[in-house]
C-alpha cells in the first residue's frame, strides 16, 4: 500500500481531533490560567495555518513528556531503561518502542528498523501490530492537525511523507477503512457507492411506492426552494464549487500518478479511487439536479406553499411512517437470509442518505447498526479476502495470480463475506464523515466538503439539537458495534471514535461511550486486544486534554478484568524476560534454519487464527501490555497534572492494581507517592487510596527491611476528621481497607500511635451514620485485640501520662492519647441502634484473660457490619422490633390452655410505688376500652360482656319495677319518684 | 541556675533539632504548663516554671539538680545530650529506629547498631540524622545518628553499621555515679 492511499484514509480523521480537543478543553477553561489559554489559542491558530510546514512527525509535546519523565524518575530502575539510549533501545518492551517511535526524528528510522526486526520475531500476528502502528499513526496525524482545505499544501505533505518514511510503505493498512471504495456490480463495471444506491433507489421507488416518491420530491423541492429563496436565487452556486473541487482533484491526480510510479502495487487502485472521487461528486450533483428538474416539471411548488403547517406536519409523519416500513421490510429481509439478501442493505443506505428528515436518518442509522450487529459473523474476515477487496477488481479477475480452486459453497461464502465487508466499510466511512461534519457544524464552521456523510452539508439547516441527537445516534451505533463485535475487521476505527467521545462535552454522549468502554473491558471476547487498543487510545485522548479529564474516564479502567496469569509490572522497564532470552538463543541460527523457522511461524500463525482461542502466553502478554499502558497513564497524570480532577480515580486505580506493581518500581513509586502525600493530597479519600497503594506494595515487596511509613500515618490522621462531612460518608469502605492495612498488622505500629488513632476514630464515630460508626466501633474492637496495651484507654484511674490529651494535634504521635479515656464508647452504648450495645458491652468488659480465649473470627468484620446495616437509603436497618411480650401475658396464656379455655379470673394488685407494667396497662385497657373489646373476642371480653349484660339486665328490671312503682304512685306522690329516676339514669350512664 | 545565653541556646537547640526537628516548639509551648530550660553548673535542665520559681530560693551551690536533665555543655562549649532526656526525645522523635530483641543488649552496652539488628526504620530517613531507638515493644532504649538512609539500608549487608551510638539506657547503670 502506498502512502497516498494512507493519506486519504487518514484524512477523514484529521479534522475531528482538532475540533474535539478544542471542545474538550473548553469546558475546563476554568482550571487554566489566562496565560495558558492564550497559549492554546495561538497554538491552534498556528496549527490551522502552518500545519503543513511542520512536516516531520515530531510532536513537540511528546518530546517534552519524555525528557521530563527522565528527570522525574531519576531513581534507579528508570535510569536503567533510558529511552533515548540507542544501545538499550531494543531491549525495551515492544509496545514502548512503538509508543516512542515518533518522539524523536533521529530515533525514528532506528525505531522502524527495530520494529521490523521485532515484527519478524514476535509471535503476535501481524494484524495486531499493524493496528498498533496505525493507532500511533492516526494520533500523529491528528496532532499534526493539518488542514485539508489547502490543496497545495497537501502536495507538500505528500512529498514530505515520501521522504520521511520509505519504510512505512510496507505497512499494510487493510484494517483502516478506505474512503469511497469502489463497488463492483454484477456486470463487472465499477460503480461508486452513490451510483449504486441511486440506481437502486430509483428502481425501487418506481416499482414500490409512487406516493412516497412524490412526497419525497415534494419534501426535497420544498426545502430546496426555501434554500434558494434564502440564497437569493443562486442555484448554480453549488455545482460551480463542486466542479472547482473536482478540477482540483483532477489536478492532483496526475501529480499523484507521477509519484505512484515508485510503488507499483497501489498505483491502479489509487487511480481508480481518485476517479471515483470525481465521479462521486458529480453524482451528487446529478442527483440533486434530477430531483430539481423533476420537481420543477411537476409544478407542485404552488400546491406546496398552500399547505398549512398542520398538513405539512402530517405529511412529514406519513413520510416517517413509510420510511419506517421500508426500513423494517429491508432489515427483516436481510436478517431472514443474510447470504442471499445482503444486497438489500443498499436500500437502507439509500433511505438514509436520500431523506432529509433527521428522524428517518436516525432510524436508518440505528437499523443499519442492528442489521450489522446481527449478521456480522463471529470471526474476523480473512486477511486475504480483505486484501482482495482493497485491491479492487484487478486481483479478483485473477490477473496473473493463480487462484486456488474453491468449491462452490466456499465461493459463495467468500462472495458473501466480501460484500458484507464492503458494506460495513461503507457504513463506517459514512459514520466517520458525518461525525466530522457534525462536529464542524456544531463548532459553527464550514465543514470541508471532503466526504459524504449521512447528510448533505449544503442541504437543509439542521438545528444544534438535531445535530447533537444525530451524533448521539451515530455514537450509539458505533459503541454497540464495538461491544458486540470487537473481533471484527475495522475495529480500530470504532475504538478511536468511541474513546475520543468519552471526553466529549455533552455528558450524555460521553457517558454512553464510557459505558460502552466499560462493558467492553468486562466482556472482551478478543482476549484483551481490543481493550489494549482502547486503553492506548484513551491515554492519547487524556494527553491531548492535558490530563484535565473527568475522573469517570479514568475510573473506567477499574472495570478491567485481569486474570492471574499477569506478571508483575514495572511500567518503565522490560516487558518480560522472554525478549532478552529469545535474543540470545537466536544468535546461533544459520540462514537456512532461520528460513525454516519463518515458515514454521507463518504456519503456526495460521493455525492459531483457525483456533480462535487465546493461549495463556498470549493472554499474559496482552494483559501485561494493558496494565502497563494503564500504569503509564496513571503516572503521567500524577506527575504532570497532580491537580487534575482525575487524580482521585487514578489513586483508586493504583490502589486496586497495586499488587501487580513489580519490585523494581518500588522506589520510584514510593517517591511519587511521598511527594503526593506531602503536598498533593487534600481529601481524605485520596489519602486513603494513596495509603492503600503504599502499604500494599511495601507489604509485598518490602522484603527484609521493615519500614515505618510515618508521613502516611500523619496525613491520614490529620485528615481523618474530614470523614464527618456528609460528602465523605461514602469513603468509609476505603477507610476500613486502608486502616486495616495501616494498623491491622500485629505489632507493626507503635502503641501510642494506635491509641491515638483509636481515640480519634471513636470521636468520629459519634458523628457518622449508624452503620458507619458501627463498623468503626467494631474495627476499634479489633485493634483492642491486636494491641492489648491500648486497653489503657479504657481505664479511668491510675493512668500515668505526662501532660494532657491534645485533640487537635496533626501528628498521632504527639497527641498523648493515654491522658484521655474513651468516653465516646460509653456514650455510644445509649445509641438508638440496637446493634451497638452488644458490641460495646463486649469491648468494655474486656480484660487480658478473656482476650486470649476470644475467637475473633466468629464475629463479623467491620465491613460486613457496614454492609449489613446499611440504611443510607432510608428506613431502619434492622427494622424496628415490636415490643416484647410481658412475661405475665405468656403465663396467662398457659393458664388459659391448662384450663381449656374456661373462664378464669385474674386478680392483680398493682403496687403504687412502681410504674405500671405493660401487662397491667394492657389488662386495664382491655377492661376499660369497650371499642377494642368488641373487636377482640377474647376470654376477658366475653367475661366482661357477660358481666355487663347481667348488670344491664338487673338495671333494666329495676327500671321496670321503678316504672311500675312510678305509674302506681304517679297520681299520688309525684315528688318521691323523681330522685329515684334520676338515680337510675345515673347508674345506667356509668355502666 | 540561670537562663541560657544566646550562644548557648543556639548550640543547644541545634543539637535538639537534629533529633526532634520542629517539634522543639512543642517542648516549650506546652498546653498544660509553661516549661523552660535552665543551666545549673553546666547542665541544662528542662523544668516547669513553677518549680523553677520555687527553686530560686535555694542558693546556686546547694542546688544539685532540678527538673529533667537534658545534657551538659563541655569545656569546649559543645553540648552533649544526656540519656535522661530520652523520654522527651522519644515522644517527639521525627525518625525512629526499632531494634530487634537480639541486638537490644548489644546496643545497651554501648555498641553501634548493625543492619542485622535493625527491626524497623521510618521511611525516608536521611543519612546522618538523629534517631531515637526503640525496642520492638516501643520502649525507648537510646538515641543515635544514622549512617545510611532508609533507601540505602535496603541493600546493605547484615554486618554494616546503620546507627552510631550516642546514648543508651544502659548508662543509667554504667555511669550511675556521674549522672
Curated annotation (Swiss-Prot), chain B:
Keyword RNA-binding on entry? yes
Q: Where is the PUA domain?
A: 94-170
Biological process (GO) annotations held by this record are: ribosomal large subunit biogenesis; ribosome assembly
Q: Which GO terms describe its cellular component?
A: nucleolus; preribosome, large subunit precursor
Matching entries from Gene3D superfamilies are given as: 3.10.450.220, PUA domain
Coiled-coil ranges (or none): none
Q: Which GO terms describe its molecular function?
A: RNA binding
Task: Check the record and name the InterPro entries matching this protein.
Answer: NIP7_N, Nip7_N_euk, PUA, PUA-like_sf, PUA_sf, Ribosomal_synth_fac_NIP7, UPF0113_PUA
Does the keyword section mention Nucleus? yes
Pfam families, per this entry?
pre-PUA_NIP7 (PF17833), UPF0113 (PF03657)
Q: Where in the cell is it found?
A: Nucleus, Nucleolus
- Provide the alphabetized UniProt keywords: Nucleus, Ribosome biogenesis, RNA-binding
Described function: Required for proper 27S pre-rRNA processing and 60S ribosome subunit assembly.
Q: Which family does it belong to?
A: Belongs to the NIP7 family.
Quaternary state and partners of this protein?
A: Monomer. Interacts with pre-ribosome complex. May bind to RNA.
Name of the protein = 60S ribosome subunit biogenesis protein NIP7 homolog
Amino acid at each position: 500500500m502506498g502512502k497516498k492511499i494512507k493519506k486519504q484514509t487518514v484524512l477523514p480523521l484529521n479534522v475531528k481531533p482538532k475540533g474535539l480537543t478544542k471542545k474538550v478543553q473548553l469546558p475546563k477553561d476554568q482550571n487554566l490560567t489566562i496565560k495558558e489559554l492564550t497559549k492554546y489559542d495561538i497554538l491552534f491558530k498556528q496549527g490551522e495555518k502552518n500545519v503543513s510546514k511542520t512536516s516531520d512527525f515530531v510532536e513537540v509535546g511528546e518530546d517534552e513528556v519524555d525528557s521530563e519523565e527522565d528527570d522525574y524518575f531519576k531513581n534507579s530502575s528508570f535510569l536503567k531503561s533510558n529511552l533515548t539510549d540507542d544501545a538499550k533501545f531494543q531491549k525495551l518492551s515492544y509496545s514502548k518502542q512503538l509508543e516512542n517511535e515518533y518522539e524523536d526524528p533521529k530515533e525514528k528510522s532506528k525505531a522502524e528498523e527495530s520494529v521490523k526486526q521485532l515484527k519478524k520475531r514476535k509471535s503476535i500476528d501481524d494484524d495486531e501490530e499493524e493496528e498498533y502502528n496505525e493507532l500511533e499513526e492516526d494520533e500523529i496525524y491528528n496532532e499534526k492537525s493539518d488542514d485539508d482545505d489547502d490543496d497545495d499544501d497537501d502536495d507538500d505533505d505528500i512529498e514530505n511523507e515520501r521522504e520521511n518514511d520509505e519504510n512505512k510503505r510496507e505497512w499494510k493498512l487493510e484494517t483502516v477503512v478506505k474512503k469511497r471504495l469502489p463497488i463492483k456490480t454484477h456486470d463487472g463495471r465499477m460503480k461508486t457507492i452513490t451510483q449504486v444506491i441511486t440506481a437502486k433507489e430509483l428502481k425501487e421507488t418506481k416499482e414500490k411506492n409512487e406516493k412516497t416518491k412524490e412526497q419525497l420530491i415534494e419534501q426535497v423541492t420544498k426545502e430546496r426552494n426555501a434554500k434558494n429563496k434564502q440564497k437569493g436565487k443562486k442555484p448554480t452556486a453549488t455545482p460551480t464549487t463542486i466542479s472547482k473541487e473536482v478540477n482540483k482533484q483532477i489536478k492532483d491526480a496526475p501529480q499523484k500518478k507521477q509519484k505512484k510510479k515508485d510503488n507499483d502495487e497501489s498505483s491502479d487502485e489509487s487511480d481508480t479511487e481518485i476517479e471515483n472521487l470525481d465521479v462521486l461528486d458529480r453524482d451528487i450533483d446529478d442527483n440533486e439536479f434530477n430531483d430539481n428538474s423533476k420537481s420543477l416539471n411537476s409544478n407542485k411548488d404552488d400546491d406546496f406553499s398552500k399547505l398549512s403547517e398542520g398538513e405539512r406536519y402530517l405529511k412529514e409523519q406519513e413520510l416517517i411512517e413509510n420510511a419506517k416500513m421500508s426500513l423494517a421490510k429491508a432489515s427483516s429481509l436481510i436478517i431472514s437470509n443474510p447470504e442471499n439478501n445482503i444486497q438489500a442493505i443498499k436500500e437502507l443506505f439509500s433511505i438514509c442518505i436520500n431523506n432529509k428528515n433527521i428522524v428517518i436518518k436516525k432510524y436508518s442509522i440505528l437499523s443499519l447498526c442492528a442489521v450489522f450487529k446481527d449478521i456480522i459473523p463471529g470471526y474476523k474476515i480473512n486477511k486475504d479476502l480483505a486484501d482482495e477487496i482493497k485491491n479492487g477488481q484487478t486481483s479478483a479477475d485473477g490477473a496473473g495470480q493463480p487462484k486456488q480452486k474453491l468449491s462452490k459453497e466456499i465461493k459463495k461464502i467468500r462472495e458473501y463475506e466480501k460484500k458484507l465487508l464492503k458494506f460495513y466499510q461503507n457504513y463506517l466511512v459514512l459514520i466517520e464523515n458525518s461525525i466530522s461534519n457534525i462536529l464542524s457544524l456544531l463548532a459553527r464552521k464550514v465543514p470541508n466538503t471532503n466526504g459524504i456523510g449521512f447528510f448533505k452539508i449544503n442541504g437543509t439547516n439542521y438545528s444544534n439539537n438535531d445535530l447533537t441527537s444525530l451524533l448521539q445516534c451515530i455514537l450509539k451505533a458505533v459503541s454497540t458495534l464495538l461491544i458486540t463485535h470487537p473481533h471484527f475487521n475495522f475495529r480500530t476505527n470504532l475504538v478511536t471514535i468511541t474513546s475520543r467521545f468519552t471526553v466529549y462535552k455533552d455528558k450524555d454522549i460521553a457517558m454512553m461511550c464510557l459505558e460502552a468502554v466499560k462493558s467492553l473491558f468486562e466482556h472482551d471476547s478478543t482476549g484483551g486486544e481490543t481493550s489494549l487498543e482502547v486503553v492506548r487510545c484513551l491515554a492519547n485522548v487524556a494527553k491531548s486534554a492535558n490530563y484535565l479529564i473527568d475522573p469517570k474516564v479514568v475510573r473506567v479502567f477499574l472495570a478491567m478484568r485481569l486474570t492471574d496469569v499477569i506478571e508483575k509490572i514495572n511500567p518503565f522497564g522490560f516487558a518480560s524476560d522472554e525478549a532478552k532470552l529469545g535474543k540470545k538463543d537466536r544468535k546461533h541460527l544459520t540462514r537456512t534454519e532461520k528460513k525454516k523457522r519463518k515458515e514454521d511461524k507463518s504456519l503456526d500463525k495460521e493455525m492459531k487464527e483457525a483456533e480462535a482461542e487465546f493461549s495463556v502466553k498470549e493472554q499474559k502478554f496482552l494483559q501485561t501490555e494493558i496494565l502497563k499502558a494503564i500504569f503509564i497513564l496513571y503516572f503521567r497524570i500524577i506527575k504532570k497534572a497532580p491537580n487534575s480532577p482525575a487524580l482521585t480515580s487514578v489513586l483508586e486505580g493504583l490502589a486496586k492494581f497495586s499488587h501487580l506493581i513489580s519490585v523494581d518500581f518500588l522506589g520510584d513509586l514510593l517517591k511519587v507517592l511521598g511527594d503526593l502525600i506531602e503536598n498533593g493530597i487534600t481529601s481524605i479519600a485520596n489519602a486513603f487510596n494513596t495509603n492503600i497503594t503504599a502499604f500494599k506494595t511495601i507489604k509485598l515487596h518490602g522484603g527484609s527491611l521493615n519500614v515505618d511509613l510515618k508521613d502516611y500515618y500523619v496525613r491520614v490522621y490529620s485528615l481523618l476528621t474530614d470523614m464527618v462531612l456528609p460528602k465523605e460518608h461514602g469513603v468509609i469502605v476505603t477507610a476500613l481497607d486502608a486502616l486495616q492495612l495501616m494498623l491491622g498488622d500485629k505489632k507493626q505500629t507503635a502503641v501510642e500511635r494506635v491509641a491515638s488513632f483509636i481515640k480519634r476514630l471513636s470521636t468520629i464515630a459519634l458523628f457518622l451514620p449508624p452503620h458507619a460508626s458501627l463498623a468503626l466501633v467494631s474495627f476499634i474492637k479489633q485493634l483492642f485485640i491486636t494491641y492489648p496495651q491500648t486497653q489503657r484507654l479504657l481505664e479511668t484511674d491510675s493512668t500515668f501520662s505526662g501532660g494532657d490529651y491534645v485533640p487537635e494535634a496533626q501528628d498521632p504521635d504527639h497527641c498523648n492519647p493515654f491522658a484521655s479515656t474513651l468516653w465516646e464508647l460509653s456514650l455510644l452504648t445509649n445509641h438508638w441502634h440496637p446493634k451497638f450495645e452488644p458490641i460495646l458491652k463486649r469491648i468494655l468488659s474486656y480484660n487480658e484473660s478473656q482476650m486470649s480465649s476470644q475467637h475473633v473470627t466468629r464475629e463479623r468484620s467491620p465491613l460486613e457490619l457496614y454492609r449489613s446495616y446499611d440504611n443510607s437509603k432510608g428506613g431502619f436497618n434492622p427494622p424496628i422490633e415490636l415490643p416484647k411480650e410481658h412475661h405475665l401475658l405468656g403465663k396467662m396464656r398457659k393458664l388459659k390452655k391448662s384450663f381449656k379455655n374456661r373462664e378464669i379470673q385474674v386478680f392483680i394488685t398493682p403496687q403504687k410505688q412502681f410504674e405500671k407494667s405493660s401487662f397491667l396497662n394492657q389488662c386495664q385497657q382491655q377492661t376499660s376500652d369497650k371499642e377494642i373489646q368488641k373487636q377482640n373476642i377474647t376470654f376477658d371480653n366475653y367475661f366482661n360482656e357477660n358481666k355487663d349484660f347481667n348488670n344491664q339486665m338487673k338495671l333494666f328490671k329495676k327500671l321496670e319495677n321503678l316504672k311500675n312503682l312510678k305509674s302506681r304512685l304517679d297520681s299520688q306522690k309525684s315528688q318521691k319518684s323523681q330522685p329515684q329516676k334520676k338515680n337510675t339514669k345515673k347508674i345506667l350512664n356509668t355502666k | 541556675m540561670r537562663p541560657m545565653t544566646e550562644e548557648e541556646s543556639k548550640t543547644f537547640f541545634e543539637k535538639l533539632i537534629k533529633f526532634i526537628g520542629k517539634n522543639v516548639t512543642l517542648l516549650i509551648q506546652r498546653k498544660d504548663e509553661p516549661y523552660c530550660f535552665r543551666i545549673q553548673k553546666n547542665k541544662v535542665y528542662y523544668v516547669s516554671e513553677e518549680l523553677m520559681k520555687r527553686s530560686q530560693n535555694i542558693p546556686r551551690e546547694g542546688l544539685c539538680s532540678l527538673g529533667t536533665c537534658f545534657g551538659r555543655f563541655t569545656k569546649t562549649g559543645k553540648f552533649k545530650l544526656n540519656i535522661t532526656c530520652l523520654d522527651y526525645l522519644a515522644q517527639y522523635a521525627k525518625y525512629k529506629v526499632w531494634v530487634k530483641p537480639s541486638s537490644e543488649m548489644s546496643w545497651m552496652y554501648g555498641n553501634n547498631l548493625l543492619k542485622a539488628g535493625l527491626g524497623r526504620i521510618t521511611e525516608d530517613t536521611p543519612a546522618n540524622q538523629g534517631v531515637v531507638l526503640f525496642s520492638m515493644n516501643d520502649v525507648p532504649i537510646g538515641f543515635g545518628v544514622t549512617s545510611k538512609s532508609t533507601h540505602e539500608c535496603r541493600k546493605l549487608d547484615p554486618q554494616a553499621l546503620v546507627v552510631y551510638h550516642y546514648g543508651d539506657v544502659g548508662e543509667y547503670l554504667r555511669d550511675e555515679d556521674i549522672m
